[in-house]
């Protein structure tokens, strides 16, 4: 069964697995463009409902293909459970009122290149090749955070400028998505403590080796939020990079680990940008899902000039500064000494 046949099968049969109050529900599909991904979404809207969950059919199709024994009846029952158990309980009027959502705004960071089409229809700010976008936290429970992506039409509804939206989102983000900084070693240790009782002897030995290796590596810090989901934007919180520089007592490199976190490494002369860039490329290619990747580049924060930029650009600026300093010094040496000449006066009594 190909994907189109799968979609039609779900659309034609989903109501057979839903309660009686869904018999007049409207079943539709639409192409969804989200940050970092595009998919075909299924919506089942009961009469009178303003909002309804959009179910990712691409994701369900991949799961269906990966399990040959699964029937379409099982798939439809799964979708029906999602429809029934996950209605969106949202006050639509409140979402459309900017004063009601202003304190629920938060930012996300994504690849500007990978999301070019989506960003054409959404307010955003670029930080090099990273894009900051704006979202409203709709609800939060044990399953995670429900949110709404602010696009141009919603911004127009709010009647504010993109600049005002950015300013307000920067104020509220640290309260909605609380920042968290920890060392790589601490995270591995936390994992070790949580899982140690469930590990086999071989797994336990492997984790202990990883802990040993991490203690010999340069000190990386993980910048994310307390939920550790969509936490890469924390690096752009107001004064965050300045505070990080004070903590480290140094400039630092920033590695785009994924949309969920950034890695920070002090620029103490032990590593160079090229080595770090190779590391990012390898990790992206082997360990990060395509939908969660940011970029293959490495960034740098200059604590003296308070500049966030690509590491290559920082190196260029330093060379330009050194060249200018050498030029100024040379000009100073070539300038002749200007000694004060005293005029002799004849004095007569």
Give residue spans per PLM region.
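Basic, alpha-helical nucleic-acid-binding regions used in initiation and control of genome expression
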Residues: 2-3, 19, 70-77, 285-287
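C-terminal structured domain segments
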Residues: 257-263, 267-294
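Short amphipathic alpha-helix segments
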Residues: 232-245
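A short linear hydrophobic-aromatic micro-motif
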Residues: 250-254
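Non-Sec secretion/translocation targeting segments of pathogen effectors
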Residues: 325-349
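Charged, alpha-helical interface segments at or near domain boundaries
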Residues: 28-223
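Helix-rich interaction surfaces within compact, conserved domain-sized segments
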Residues: 279-309, 314-315
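N-terminal alpha-helical "arm" segments
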Residues: 1-36
